[in-house]
Structure formats: C-alpha cells, structure tokens
C-alpha cells in the first residue's frame, strides 16, 4: 500500500433508493512516482480517466456512497502499474465506489465495473474497458488498441488516429465507432437493430474494427 496525502469529506443526504445508501464520502490523493499503466476495478461505481497535464501528478478521486459500512478501497503502485480496487461491503450492505483518475496520456488502462459507466478521454495508451450494466465512452483517443464490452449499455468509441484494432460489444445497447480517414477491415453485426458502415472498407486492411450488438444499432462512421 503506498502512502499518500488524502483529504476526506463525509456528508449525509437523501437515500438514493428506498433502502439504498444514504451516506456519501470523497477522498482525493496524489500518486508519487511514474505511472505507465492503470488497473481499476469497482463493484458498482463509475470510472473516469482524464489526461493530466505534462509534468503533472497522477491524482485519484474516490467517491463513496454507502449505508452502514464505509467502503475501504485499496491502491498500490508496482512496476509502474497503479492498481485501484474496490469490493462490495459484504453481508448485504450496499455501497459503491466511483473513481476519477488524472493519468498520463500514454498510460494503458484496464477498467472494470459491475454496474457503472466508464469514460476515457485523451488516451494514447491501450484501452480495455468492461462493465456489466453501464455505458462505455472513449473520446479524443489515439490508442492503437481499444476494446470495450458492456452487457446492457451503449458503447461510443471516438478515435482521432487509425487504430490497429478496435472493438465495441454490447448485449442490449447501441455501438458507435468513430474513425478518421482511412480504410478499415470492418465486422459490424446486430441481431435486432440497424447497421450503418460509412467508412471505406477493405478486408485486407491492417486496421481491424469489430462492432457487435444483440439488440441495438451498430454504426461505424467517420469521426
């Protein structure tokens, strides 16, 4: 566990649901040293990754909602990888931990949440994102690889340079992939919605694109 200077604010407010969490807390801390990769896992909150200014410090904000027991997420840095992990509170207690991380653009990210949204902005490192019930959004990215999967939400991936491989998959929402000029090997399928591919396609292209949904629309369009 790395040491850090942290600020904590505790608030009480209205219950999010009739029997849901009714307390909130927030903690922000900086992470010393060089971070080249991020792994973040949370039981039910959102995850947001935004670029830090050149030379700036990596900073993490954790936002908690809970009822009886305050969450105790962990964080550590090993070999340049920052690992954030938040489990449920156990014994039927309800709680969520949401993350907002200021991160170098070139750091790779591996993000997983059981029920929240995932948002990544300005990344140039590889992206892997998975959520059970929320949306996944990638904006202004030049990542060479990006993979996004959600069971019930929408996927919207916008790249400003041609990736080597990009994929968006959802069981029940829409998939939209936005790409710059170029030709792409595209596999775009939907079982119950509309299909739109308006970028130049070439089965032999080195730029592989996969977009799949079982129940929504699928679109691969110019950015």
Model feature map: region roles:
Residues 38-40, 111, 129, 148, ...:
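Active-site alpha-helical segments that house and flank conserved acidic catalytic motifs
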